[in-house]
From Swiss-Prot:
A Pfam short name: SIR2
Gene field: cobB
Record-linked InterPro entries: DHS-like_NAD/FAD-binding_dom, NAD-dep_sirtuin_deacylases, Sirtuin, Sirtuin_cat_small_dom_sf, Sirtuin_class_III, Ssirtuin_cat_dom
EC number(s) recorded for this UniProt protein: 2.3.1.286
Active site: 147
Organism: Escherichia coli (strain K12)
UniProt function note: NAD-dependent lysine deacetylase that specifically removes acetyl groups on target proteins. Also acts as a protein-lysine deacylase by mediating protein desuccinylation and de-2-hydroxyisobutyrylation. Modulates the activities of several proteins which are inactive in their acylated form. Activates the enzyme acetyl-CoA synthetase (acs) by deacetylating 'Lys-609' in the inactive, acetylated form of the enzyme. May also modulate the activity of other propionyl-adenosine monophosphate (AMP)-forming enzymes.
Superkingdom of source: Bacteria
GO annotations of cellular component type: cytoplasm
UniProt name for this protein: NAD-dependent protein deacylase
Alphabetized UniProt keyword annotations: Cytoplasm, Metal-binding, NAD, Transferase, Zinc
Quaternary context: Forms a 1:1 complex with acetyl-CoA synthetase (Acs).
Length: 279
């Protein structure tokens, strides 16, 4: 009998041909008609909380199940929102304000990935588990936020997404529907399906290089991306403070602070591009 993870992977793989064609028509990895000898590699990067920690973004502590001293069941589940929407809104209001403090800035790792995108153009895709906007502020544009975005909210009835930089109050409603509906954070909570999974799995099937940065390897489906990339022949790289739960799956590994190991690896990769020799 298939596990929940197995059911999800099976469902995502069913329509590969149609989704692959759709991905080719989008910006990501679209220039496959270039002769093979002239091609730049297709690089897919996955980032987790470890890349933003050095910018001052506090991370969820899986060991004790707390996030900013709150139980995740209370502030990061649909059931928690149903029980106490004001608590949940207050929690994300505080996170939203923190993200916009002047001391919270992209670090050297974010800037290095923006430099890598500049070199690769539309053969680069960044998938992040983070809900902050530090990648965009560093200059990345080809970004999929699989866990949502803190500076957005969505209608709890229609799902329409709105940019939102201030606090959300009980009086704030979405008026896209016939009757005003409550707003909720545009964040994927525990028990909800991550966003953009069709595109992510198609990109994994087309990537030449897969790089995971600052991830724990505890949370699926993201923890399974390295295995999926390997199935399709990608070279795999882990850049992390310490080995992740799936660290043994990677062909190449570098450990240390993200602000150190990411710029170093990007420089190595760019030198290889210029020399015509990529891992």
């Amino acid at each position: 009998m298939l596990s929940r993870r197995g059911h999800r992977l099976s469902r995502f793989r069913k329509n590969k041909r149609r989704l692959r064609e759709r991905l080719r028509q989008r910006i990501f990895f679209r220039d496959k008609v270039v002769p093979e000898a002239m091609e730049k590699p297709r690089v897919l990067v996955l980032t987790g909380a470890g890349i933003s920690a050095e910018s001052g973004i506090r991370t969820f502590r899986a060991a004790d199940g707390l996030w900013e001293e709150h139980r995740v069941e209370d502030v990061a589940t649909p059931e928690g929102f149903d029980r106490d929407p004001e608590l949940v809104q207050a929690f994300y209001n505080a996170r939203r304000r923190q993200l916009q403090q002047p001391e919270i800035q992209p670090n050297a790792a974010h800037l290095a990935l923006a430099k890598l995108q500049d070199a690769l153009g539309d053969r680069f895709l960044l998938v992040t588990q983070n809900i902050d906007n530090l990648h965009e502020r560093a200059g990345n544009t080809n970004v999929i936020h699989m866990h949502g975005e803190l500076l957005k909210v969505r209608c709890s009835q229609s799902g329409q997404v709105l940019d939102w930089t201030g606090d959300v109050t009980p009086e704030d409603k979405c008026h896209c529907c016939q009757f005003p509906a409550p707003l909720r954070p545009h964040v994927v909570w525990f028990g909800e399906m991550p966003l953009g999974m069709d595109e992510i799995y198609m990109a994994l099937s087309m990537a030449d290089i897969f790089i995971a940065i600052g991830t724990s390897g505890h949370v699926y489906p993201a923890a399974g991306f390295v295995h999926e990339a390997k199935l399709h022949g990608a070279h795999t790289v882990e850049l992390n403070l310490e080995p992740s739960q799936v660290g043994n799956e990677f062909a190449e590994k570098y450990y240390g602070p993200a602000s150190q190991v990411v710029p170093e690896f990007v420089e190595k990769l760019l030198k290889g591009l210029k020399a015509g020799s990529i891992a």
